[in-house]
Amino acid sequence: MQFEVKDLINKIKKDGLDEAERLASEIILNAKQEAEAIILKAESEAKELKIKAEKEAYDYKRYSLEASRQAFRDLVIGTENSIKSLFKSALKDSVSSVYDSNFLRELIIRVLDVWGKDDKIDIMLNESDIDNLSSILKTSIRNKFGAEIEIKPFKGINKGFKVQQRDGSLYYDFTSEAIADILFEYLNPRFKEIIKLD
């Protein structure tokens, strides 16, 4: 019986040890699997974070470059517009300087020479030019055209004049502003080539 008890104790020990080893192996295996899953999850999250960070960096770089390009375009357009404005102002001043009393008188007479003699015409000048030219123009014009032409002051004119039929059907603008605008439009393509920054 002693051997049976001893065998029974040994068997219980062996079964307990086997069970403990099996449980330990199972715990170790589960721990390894959990560790591998945690590592895989961490690697996957790290990869996603890296991809997200790279995309954000790329987007930031792209947006920064686009903002820089837009700022440069705005600067070029602003500079071009400033230069155009200066050029247009200088052109207007240049045209205005030509419009002295003698030039205006000659130009008005030449414009009226090609106008129909039966038309009723209004000539509009600024007030200072009317004071300087009124008597000379009235004498020159009335000799050719009679009373069909009136000379009127017009506050909106700096230099130059406007001519229109009294019924308003035909109108010509010979003001320094209008002539400068026409010249600027004519010169603008050439001007653009000169200041082209490409």
Swiss-Prot record:
SUPFAM superfamilies: V-type ATPase subunit E-like (SSF160527)
Record flagged with keyword Ion transport: yes
Domain of life of the source: Bacteria
BP GO annotations: proton motive force-driven plasma membrane ATP synthesis
Keywords in alphabetical order: ATP synthesis, Hydrogen ion transport, Ion transport, Transport
GO CC aspect terms: proton-transporting two-sector ATPase complex, catalytic domain
Coiled coil stretches, renumbered: none
HAMAP family with a match to the protein in the record: ATP_synth_E_arch
Family: Belongs to the V-ATPase E subunit family.
Designated name of the protein: V-type proton ATPase subunit E
Gene name of the record: atpE
